[in-house]
Every structure is written in C-alpha cells, then in structure tokens.
Amino acid sequence: MPEPIAFDESQVDISSIDFSDLEAKYHVPEPEHSYEHFVICDGAPIAPEAKAPVLKKVLTKLFSQCGKVVDMFMPLENGQTKGFLIIELDSAAAADKAVKQLNGKKLDVKHRLAVNKLPDMEKYALNDNISEEFREPAIPEFRSHGYLKSWLLDPNGREQFMLHHHDTVGVYWYKKNIQPEEVIEPRAHWTSASMKFSPKGTYLFSFFPGGVQAWGGERI
C-alpha cells in the first residue's frame, strides 16, 4: 500500500485562483433588517427622570398583553421623559396587535395613547405629498339643525313617545284619550338593536354594530 503524501495547505499560493463563480453560487445574503415589529407610542405621560422606571414598567406590562416586549426606548430631555417611546416586540404580528388594541387607549384621565408601527411613520414622514408648510384648515360654514328641544314648543303641550315593533320604529305625540299622531313617519331598519331617548329627551339614539348615531331637531 503506498504511503500517504504529506500536504501542507499553508504552502499553497491561492492568490491567483478566481473563486468569484463559487462565491456567487454559494453566497448567503445578509438578512434585511425589518422594523415591522417596532411600534411608536405617543401620548405617554411626561414624567421626571426619577419616575421613568416606574412609567416604563407600567407601559411594559400594558404592551406585554400583545406580545413579548424585547426592548423599550424612552428618550429623556431636560431631566424628564418626552411623552413618546419606541417599543420592540417579538414579532410583526404582536406589533399589529398592539396597534389594533392600544391605539387610542386611555392610560388615565389626562393621557390617551397613539400607537403606530414604525414603518408607517417613516412612510408618512418621507411622503412627498405632505407639505411642511402650515395651512390654515378650512372650517365649514355652520348649518343649523333647528331647535333641538322643539318638542317643548308644542302648542298642545304633548309629550313624545317611541314604539319599536319588529324592525320598525316610530315616534308619536301623546295625549290621553286621543289617537297618537306621528311626529315622523315610522322607519324600518332604523336600528339594529334598540333605540333610546337621551335622559332629557333632546336626542334619540340608534344602535349599530359599528357604533351609535344620535338624532335630534325638528326633523329627525
């Protein structure tokens, strides 16, 4: 059996060998860093620096309801927090959940949070359609909806009452021993649940899955 040939790799000059084809074939690209799991929270309390750890603990507990909080950056200026912070969550899904659940949430009586994903903020900030010049907002001309308590001016001194039968709701004038008179023509599908008068009778509320609508004035 032949003896093995001794081979010292350090003695081989590879400077003249072109590996570009192999490098291109087996190149592993660096993963593109994504900010989809980052959110910006505005509207937080402006607190002294000494109370920043307590505030951070409260907000960490709040955002932990949406996913694991990896990191939280709370900038300081002149010895106090600036009212906003950047939160890194463990996934883009957790960031989406944070925006959905916590945007607009009241932290206390004076503070309401505004939560947005970091890429969205960059998208709006880099949008050429957004002007940096302040423009006075156009205020629409006031339109009167009539006297909201016009029913108090009824010459016969009658009260109003509401009837809800199946899908139809009607509002009527009432006076004892007199056939009820329609205030407005009964409407079908005016509400998806019930309807209620406000405590002082100024408004009539209809309820829908998407919210509540108020009705009032001489012509509801």
UniProtKB/Swiss-Prot annotation:
Swiss-Prot/TrEMBL keywords: Cytoplasm, Initiation factor, Protein biosynthesis, RNA-binding
Ranges where the record places region Sufficient for interaction with HCR1 and TIF32: 1-94
Single GO MF annotation: RNA binding
Ranges where the record places region Sufficient for interaction with PIC8: 1-220
Database matches in InterPro entries: EIF3B, eIF3B_RRM, Nucleotide-bd_a/b_plait_sf, RBD_domain_sf, RRM_dom
Matches recorded under SMART domains: RRM
Subcellular location: Cytoplasm
GO cellular component: eukaryotic translation initiation factor 3 complex
Domain RRM: 37-120
SUPFAM superfamilies (UniProt xref): RNA-binding domain, RBD
Function in brief: RNA-binding component of the eukaryotic translation initiation factor 3 (eIF-3) complex, which is involved in protein synthesis of a specialized repertoire of mRNAs and, together with other initiation factors, stimulates binding of mRNA and methionyl-tRNAi to the 40S ribosome. The eIF-3 complex specifically targets and initiates translation of a subset of mRNAs involved in cell proliferation.
Assembly and binders: Component of the eukaryotic translation initiation factor 3 (eIF-3) complex.
Sequence similarity: Belongs to the eIF-3 subunit B family.
Protein name: Eukaryotic translation initiation factor 3 subunit B
Native species: Pichia angusta (Yeast)
Classification of source organism: Eukaryota, Fungi, Dikarya, Ascomycota, Saccharomycotina
Gene: TIF32
